[in-house]
Amino acid sequence: MRNWLFCDYESGEDFIVEAPTKEEAVEIAKEYFADPCGNPDEISDFEAEMMGFDTY
């Protein structure tokens, strides 16, 4: 599984979505947040763990 770093423009929250593709990650982010950024950055497992953001 790959890690995608998002921010939500409405709440200002940063969060991570685990998904195999960027397109799937965007769809998951839209399920949980009103206005997630549409171009997330891929991050490593280590980076995701160290950031400590909520993961979906």
Question: Language-model segments: what does each one mean?
Answer:
Residues 18-35:
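Short, flexible N-terminal segments of the mature chain
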Residues 31-56:
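Short, mixed-charge low-complexity intrinsically disordered segments
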Residues 1-13:
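Short aromatic-glycine-(Arg/Gly/Cys) micro-motifs in beta-strand/loop hairpins
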Residues 12-23, 55:
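Short, low-complexity, intrinsically disordered N-terminal segments
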Residues 3-5, 19, 39:
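Residue-level detector of functional hotspots within protein domains
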